[in-house]
Amino acid sequence: VDKRRPIWVMLLSSYWQDGNSLGVDAIMTNYPEDVK
């Protein structure tokens, strides 16, 4: 894992790779300022 990447980028990547909305839900819950 490249620690230089923000956690939300890794979560978003997991969302696209897994096709699972939980990745986006985690971003919305934990990093609301990043998605506004």
Swiss-Prot record:
One of its GO terms (biological process) is killing of cells of another organism. The keyword Lyase applies. Contains 2 disulfide bonds. Expressed by the venom gland. Its cofactor is Mg(2+). Dermonecrotic toxins cleave the phosphodiester linkage between the phosphate and headgroup of certain phospholipids (sphingolipid and lysolipid substrates), forming an alcohol (often choline) and a cyclic phosphate. This toxin acts on sphingomyelin (SM). It may also act on ceramide phosphoethanolamine (CPE), lysophosphatidylcholine (LPC) and lysophosphatidylethanolamine (LPE), but not on lysophosphatidylserine (LPS), and lysophosphatidylglycerol (LPG). It acts by transphosphatidylation, releasing exclusively cyclic phosphate products as second products. It is found in: Secreted. Its EC number is 4.6.1.-. It comes from Loxosceles gaucho. This is Dermonecrotic toxin LgSicTox-beta-LOXN2. Binds 1 Mg(2+) ion per subunit. Keywords: Cytolysis, Dermonecrotic toxin, Disulfide bond, Hemolysis, Lipid degradation, Lipid metabolism, Lyase, Magnesium, Metal-binding, Secreted, Toxin. One of its GO terms (molecular function) is metal ion binding. Belongs to the arthropod phospholipase D family. Class II subfamily. It catalyses: an N-(acyl)-sphingosylphosphocholine = an N-(acyl)-sphingosyl-1,3-cyclic phosphate + choline; an N-(acyl)-sphingosylphosphoethanolamine = an N-(acyl)-sphingosyl-1,3-cyclic phosphate + ethanolamine; a 1-acyl-sn-glycero-3-phosphocholine = a 1-acyl-sn-glycero-2,3-cyclic phosphate + choline; a 1-acyl-sn-glycero-3-phosphoethanolamine = a 1-acyl-sn-glycero-2,3-cyclic phosphate + ethanolamine. One of its GO terms (cellular component) is extracellular region. It comes from the Eukaryota.
